Amino acid sequence: MVNDTISDMLTRIRNANLAKKTSVSLPKTKVHEKMCQILEQEGFIKTFSFSETNTNELIVDLKYQDFASFGNYGVGKPCITNLKRISKPGLRIYTNSREIPKVLGGMGILILSTSKGLMTDRQARKLCLGGEILCSVW
């Protein structure tokens, strides 16, 4: 059994990207669904769907850059360069809306857990909300 499901999710996506997989399966939780929804909106993954065979499984279709520019080598570079867990079970990291850091000068995103649910750093700044910084994606 996994104690930190968010770290497990990020590790599964990272490993699937490195192995050039087209999709990866995750345990279905509300947090995973919302994080996948954010990653899809920001353009880091193609889509996510629920498994038809297993009701407790979430299927994430990974997104790669156009492989036509890479010749006949198959899949191009992954859209997700790095996934990093920030707040961990042993060391929680919180921030207010004025001190939310930018990832790579705004090129990446932070996913925050706020009182209004999970959202990106841009949405949290716009709504003047702080919260726990779950992870960074770029």
Curated annotation (Swiss-Prot):
Molecular functions (GO terms): rRNA binding; structural constituent of ribosome
Gene Ontology, cellular component aspect: chloroplast; ribonucleoprotein complex; ribosome
Keyword Ribosomal protein part of the UniProt annotation: yes
Subcellular location: Plastid, Chloroplast
Family annotation (InterPro entries): Ribosomal_uS8, Ribosomal_uS8_CS, Ribosomal_uS8_sf
GO biological process: translation
Primary site of residence: plastid
Keyword annotations from UniProtKB, A to Z: Chloroplast, Plastid, Ribonucleoprotein, Ribosomal protein, RNA-binding, rRNA-binding
UniProt-listed SUPFAM superfamilies: Ribosomal protein S8
Superkingdom classification of source: Eukaryota
Subunit structure: Part of the 30S ribosomal subunit.
Function as written in the Swiss-Prot or TrEMBL entry: One of the primary rRNA binding proteins, it binds directly to 16S rRNA central domain where it helps coordinate assembly of the platform of the 30S subunit.
NCBIfam families associated with the record: PRK00136.1
PANTHER family: 40S RIBOSOMAL PROTEIN S15A
Family according to the record: Belongs to the universal ribosomal protein uS8 family.
Protein name: Small ribosomal subunit protein uS8c
Protein species of origin: Chlorella vulgaris (Green alga)
Gene name in the database record: rps8
